[in-house]
Amino acid sequence: MWIQVRTIDGSKTCTIEDVSRKATIEELRERVWALFDVRPECQRLFYRGKQLENGYTLFDYDVGLNDIIQLLVRPDPDHLPGTSTQIEAKPCSNSPPKVKKAPRVGPSNQPSTSARARLIDPGFGIYKVNELVDARDVGLGAWFEAHIHSVTRASDGQSRGKTPLKNGSSCKRTNGNIKHKSKENTNKLDSVPSTSNSDCVAADEDVIYHIQYDEYPESGTLEMNVKDLRPRARTILKWNELNVGDVVMVNYNVESPGQRGFWFDAEITTLKTISRTKKELRVKIFLGGSEGTLNDCKIISVDEIFKIERPGAHPLSFADGKFLRRNDPECDLCGGDPEKKCHSCSCRVCGGKHEPNMQLLCDECNVAYHIYCLNPPLDKVPEEEYWYCPSCKTDSSEVVKAGERLKMSKKKAKMPSASTESRRDWGRGMACVGRTRECTIVPSNHYGPIPGIPVGSTWRFRVQVSEAGVHRPHVGGIHGRSNDGAYSLVLAGGFADEVDRGDEFTYTGSGGKNLAGNKRIGAPSADQTLTNMNRALALNCDAPLDDKIGAESRNWRAGKPVRVIRSFKGRKISKYAPEEGNRYDGIYKVVKYWPEISSSHGFLVWRYLLRRDDVEPAPWTSEGIERSRRLCLRLQYPAGYPSDKEGKKPKGQSKKQPSGTTKRPISDDDCPSASKVYKASDSAEAIEAFQLTPQQQHLIREDCQNQKLWDEVLSHLVEGPNFLKKLEQSFMCVCCQELVYQPVTTECFHNVCKDCLQRSFKAQVFSCPACRHDLGQNYIMIPNEILQTLLDLFFPGYSKGR
């Protein structure tokens, strides 16, 4: 195989050819030295976030075909004055020191209630120290319970009418959290009708009040102007005391009007008594700013309407009570009830709300735990800056840091190659590199042709055939299921007594060989049985299964189709095999199958007679050769294949292979390169255009919603088989990145799978996944049946695995 090595800055990239997956990192460093002129001790190699260390192989790091390894050049230790040859990684001297979290301001850090019970007159201003007030959040417009912490004179800049908060920012509360907003919101409430005594406010403009919110002590001390303060509301108005036009304080949730929220000033617009217990109250909410009003707002808490207190009212302190109003509960499950156990807002294990000072909050999922409810329990609250619960904590022992040894996976430890004493280098074969992509246009158990793959398509390696979905196994000759049937097979001339007549050939089943350990090939050592893949291929015959004498189909065309791929390895027994690569030859049917003694090795084998049943001409016929020329079918190479290898024959190709060798499962370790490399300039003739059926043309005209897309797609008809690739790209779901299934054509003319759109709506995302056009919560998803029928015609079988 081959890999690429690129410098960390991307300035230089080189391809390392003929590298084995069993190659050690030391061997790789020598190859890099030859290409980049960087000594091994100066190399730092990275792959997928891991630093490659000596003592391991490319297989240990899962380096695959055409993967990129990054190279970082270390300073040469021999040219560094006063340093040893070993360079140790030290912490950067200018790294910022670790800052310890400031202690959270909580009830334990507040002055005692007895110390705050006494009112202190500062000698100026309307309000006294420790007085209970309502403070207006200048960014939100809502009123919150607070108390005066201290009173100071305003500076010259503050006395000119500005009301900045501490640090020049205002606060916005959402679900109990405080978010800072810009200074632009500080004067948004100037146009709201003031409910305070204007004379008192005018006389108190040069005073700054330092307040603390009672329910949000973590916000600290904030600076407030007198116009954003008023005495604490204490009087609940009865229904018969309310009148239209009154300005009162009500509870309202701006985001969810049907739930409890914050407290706002509001003007009553509608009072309606429906029954003795059912009343309707509608108000105009004052949010702040010139346009900060909400009209026709229905209030759900009609029994909690507070009278607005004017400056000069009797001052309240903590000695008179807390006078706290009910806000939106922080937890919807328990309603904020301190006596009710809740596993959502309290300890996840016991649900208790006791001993909050012994609860730890996970910095990842924000879930609380008592230190004694953990497993194992903790003796005290940890002093670390960050703490993570057991479900979020990453096991540091599983993290491989730079310079550390790899932790071998259990899967690799069980592989035969991990325990074998053989020194055979199996890592050079293309059958060992693994797929770089997977065919998803049809499921793996698809019978019949693969959409977009015409007869005569040829690939350089077997792994490419697997990626195209024509024959999924990298090595095995038969792909199928013993309880379903066979989907494809590879004719590679593994048995000398097989007969190939082109449109009809005999095929020998698999098994009967000792492939213990990590073997890929082996001599026959036992009789074959009609099990596993042999049984799967027999099920394709239109006859009852018989594992004794075999069977012959009643109507061979009625059998299940099998995709046949001829390999260049079959050239030794068949003139119909390609000279290079692996060629798709179309659909065959099983005519009959029977057991017999092989003339080459004397063991019992199962034979199958397959006959061609395909509308496309065979690639060895004159019609097939002409069609391949019109479709410009070329030998396909993998991405990144070294260009200097094209057209060259590798070592060992000219060696004569012994006759009678049995190679059913065979790798591509020694497969020859293409003897002829086709290029686009070899033929100046136009590619045969893709032909639409009358039914497809009619349905395309009927699909008016996607007319623009169809116009673009139909312009690629002249590209032949590439038309289907363009069609797949144009109708790909933006969510699952697959061809749309049960497509919903939105009002913005985008196509999305119905299941994908339903998952989006379930996640409360009610917009088009492609353009974010708002579809609305009540959007009706109607599948585009015309488009679904068209896609089934172009890609038969693709919806089977969805």
Swiss-Prot record:
<dbReference type="GO" id="GO:0000792">
    <property type="term" value="C:heterochromatin"/>
</dbReference>
<keyword id="KW-0832">Ubl conjugation</keyword>
<keyword id="KW-1015">Disulfide bond</keyword>
<keyword id="KW-0808">Transferase</keyword>
<dbReference type="InterPro" id="IPR047468">
    <property type="entry name" value="Ubl_UHRF2"/>
</dbReference>
<feature type="compositionally biased region" description="Polar residues">
    <location>
        <begin position="82"/>
        <end position="96"/>
    </location>
</feature>
<keyword id="KW-0158">Chromosome</keyword>
<dbReference type="InterPro" id="IPR011011">
    <property type="entry name" value="Znf_FYVE_PHD"/>
</dbReference>
<comment type="pathway">
    <text>Protein modification; protein ubiquitination.</text>
</comment>
<feature type="region of interest" description="Interaction with PCNP">
    <location>
        <begin position="194"/>
        <end position="288"/>
    </location>
</feature>
<feature type="modified residue" description="Phosphoserine">
    <location>
        <position position="667"/>
    </location>
</feature>
<dbReference type="InterPro" id="IPR013083">
    <property type="entry name" value="Znf_RING/FYVE/PHD"/>
</dbReference>
<dbReference type="InterPro" id="IPR015947">
    <property type="entry name" value="PUA-like_sf"/>
</dbReference>
<dbReference type="GO" id="GO:0004842">
    <property type="term" value="F:ubiquitin-protein transferase activity"/>
</dbReference>
<protein>
    <recommendedName>
        <fullName>E3 ubiquitin-protein ligase UHRF2</fullName>
        <ecNumber>2.3.2.27</ecNumber>
    </recommendedName>
</protein>
<dbReference type="GO" id="GO:0019789">
    <property type="term" value="F:SUMO transferase activity"/>
</dbReference>
<dbReference type="GO" id="GO:0051865">
    <property type="term" value="P:protein autoubiquitination"/>
</dbReference>
<dbReference type="GO" id="GO:0008270">
    <property type="term" value="F:zinc ion binding"/>
</dbReference>
<dbReference type="InterPro" id="IPR047466">
    <property type="entry name" value="RING-HC_UHRF2"/>
</dbReference>
<dbReference type="GO" id="GO:0003677">
    <property type="term" value="F:DNA binding"/>
</dbReference>
<feature type="compositionally biased region" description="Polar residues">
    <location>
        <begin position="188"/>
        <end position="197"/>
    </location>
</feature>
<keyword id="KW-0833">Ubl conjugation pathway</keyword>
<dbReference type="InterPro" id="IPR047407">
    <property type="entry name" value="Tudor_UHRF2_rpt1"/>
</dbReference>
<dbReference type="InterPro" id="IPR017907">
    <property type="entry name" value="Znf_RING_CS"/>
</dbReference>
<dbReference type="InterPro" id="IPR029071">
    <property type="entry name" value="Ubiquitin-like_domsf"/>
</dbReference>
<dbReference type="GO" id="GO:0044027">
    <property type="term" value="P:negative regulation of gene expression via chromosomal CpG island methylation"/>
</dbReference>
<keyword id="KW-0862">Zinc</keyword>
<keyword id="KW-0479">Metal-binding</keyword>
<feature type="zinc finger region" description="RING-type">
    <location>
        <begin position="733"/>
        <end position="772"/>
    </location>
</feature>
<dbReference type="GO" id="GO:0042393">
    <property type="term" value="F:histone binding"/>
</dbReference>
<dbReference type="GO" id="GO:0061630">
    <property type="term" value="F:ubiquitin protein ligase activity"/>
</dbReference>
<feature type="zinc finger region" description="PHD-type">
    <location>
        <begin position="344"/>
        <end position="395"/>
    </location>
</feature>
<dbReference type="GO" id="GO:0016925">
    <property type="term" value="P:protein sumoylation"/>
</dbReference>
<dbReference type="GO" id="GO:0005654">
    <property type="term" value="C:nucleoplasm"/>
</dbReference>
<dbReference type="InterPro" id="IPR036987">
    <property type="entry name" value="SRA-YDG_sf"/>
</dbReference>
<keyword id="KW-0238">DNA-binding</keyword>
<dbReference type="InterPro" id="IPR021991">
    <property type="entry name" value="TTD_dom"/>
</dbReference>
<dbReference type="InterPro" id="IPR001965">
    <property type="entry name" value="Znf_PHD"/>
</dbReference>
<feature type="region of interest" description="Methyl-CpG binding and interaction with HDAC1">
    <location>
        <begin position="414"/>
        <end position="644"/>
    </location>
</feature>
<dbReference type="InterPro" id="IPR003105">
    <property type="entry name" value="SRA_YDG"/>
</dbReference>
<comment type="function">
    <text>E3 ubiquitin ligase that plays important roles in DNA methylation, histone modifications, cell cycle and DNA repair. Acts as a specific reader for 5-hydroxymethylcytosine (5hmC) and thereby recruits various substrates to these sites to ubiquitinate them. This activity also allows the maintenance of 5mC levels at specific genomic loci and regulates neuron-related gene expression. Participates in cell cycle regulation by ubiquitinating cyclins CCND1 and CCNE1 and thereby inducing G1 arrest. Also ubiquitinates PCNP leading to its degradation by the proteasome.</text>
</comment>
<dbReference type="Pfam" id="PF00240">
    <property type="entry name" value="ubiquitin"/>
</dbReference>
